[in-house]
């Protein structure tokens, strides 16, 4: 059983070849189901369309209705630090989904610890490129334990399917952040950065709360930014990377802001700082892979203004994943399962 989740998925297709129709199911926010048929996307739908619950994290209606004729199911998710009551509720919901799949006697593959890989697969296989770099930036992805500390992936760069850079952070926990004296690098086959800094996705959550919005209403914060002005310093180059300022810090309710800017100016600061950070990251992806074809994905890249800033400032052939938020994980996990268990 995966140590970060308390509901087990029996992976009954390990070492076997699956049929041609593979389903992917996302059980994080924007719960969704996708079907890949012989390497082509055949079907995609989000649970909220059936349940009428905005950003519904489940997939109960989807698995009951749309799994006929499917040869295997890939399950993906995202690590989230729940309060105990909410954790128990979410565990029951996820187990109910898995029970429906088991009752249908469909093999299950566990992709819950491959969050950024699923994002990257969705972008790469949906792009027009045969050879490309893939950049993933979001709030948080899968858990990674290292030197006795627990991190979450927040930025990843892939050379096609091969990881060349990973940024792991403890930002989601005040207790974990205190264990890291300063960001540090390690080099193996992949360049690894460990830090206590906030991800760009989480930065939008915190600033959105500070501006009086729901933490998932980053689009409102982006819109508000057009009315602001002032300094641009929430992402800066230090420790060999572009990192979020400590003005945004780990806090249980995600607000975490030390500064004193007005909401409109704080939104402006974050938007312009995030644009600068995105430009830095795309340039880094090109340098690490020696490839000007770059796919970008992860919830941050719903930021159209930032995407345009990349095009204006970087010599790049840019593909922006249209389903870069977590809903697209179902497509990515289905593609991964298809190419790992059917084509190979």
Predicted segments, located by residue:
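Short acidic/glycine-rich loops and adjacent helix/strand connectors
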Residues: 2-344
């Amino acid at each position: 059983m995966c140590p970060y989740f308390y509901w087990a998925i029996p992976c009954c297709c390990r070492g076997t070849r699956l049929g041609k129709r593979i389903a992917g199911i996302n059980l994080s926010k924007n719960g969704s189901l996708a079907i890949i048929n012989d390497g082509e996307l055949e079907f995609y739908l989000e649970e909220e369309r059936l349940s009428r619950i905005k950003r519904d994290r489940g997939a109960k209606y989807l698995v009951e209705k749309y799994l006929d004729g499917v040869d295997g199911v890939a399950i993906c998710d995202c690590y989230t630090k729940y309060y105990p009551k909410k954790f128990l509720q979410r565990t029951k919901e996820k187990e109910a989904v898995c029970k429906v799949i088991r009752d249908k006697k469909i093999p299950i593959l566990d992709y819950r610890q491959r969050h950024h890989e699923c994002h990257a697969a969705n972008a790469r296989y949906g792009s027009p490129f045969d050879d490309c770099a893939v950049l993933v930036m979001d709030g948080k992805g899968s858990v990674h334990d290292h030197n006795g500390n627990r991190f979450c992936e927040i930025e990843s760069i892939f050379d096609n399917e091969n990881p060349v850079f990973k940024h792991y952070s403890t930002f989601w926990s005040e207790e974990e952040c205190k264990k890291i004296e300063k960001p540090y690098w390690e080099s193996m086959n992949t360049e690894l950065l460990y830090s206590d800094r906030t991800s760009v996705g989480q930065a939008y959550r915190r600033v959105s709360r500070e501006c009086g919005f729901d933490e998932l209403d980053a689009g409102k914060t982006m819109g508000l930014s057009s009315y602001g002005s002032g300094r641009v310093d929430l992402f800066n180059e230090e420790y060999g990377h572009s990192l979020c300022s400590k003005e945004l810090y780990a806090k249980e309710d995600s607000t975490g802001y030390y500064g004193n800017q007005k909401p409109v100016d704080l939104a402006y600061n974050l938007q312009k700082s995030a644009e600068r950070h995105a430009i830095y990251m795309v340039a880094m992806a090109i340098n690490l892979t020696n490839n000007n074809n770059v796919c970008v994905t992860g919830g941050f890249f719903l930021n159209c203004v930032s995407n345009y800033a990349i095009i204006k400032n970087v010599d790049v052939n840019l593909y922006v994943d249209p389903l870069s938020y977590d809903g697209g994980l179902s497509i990515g996990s289905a593609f991964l399962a298809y190419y790992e268990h059917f084509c190979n």
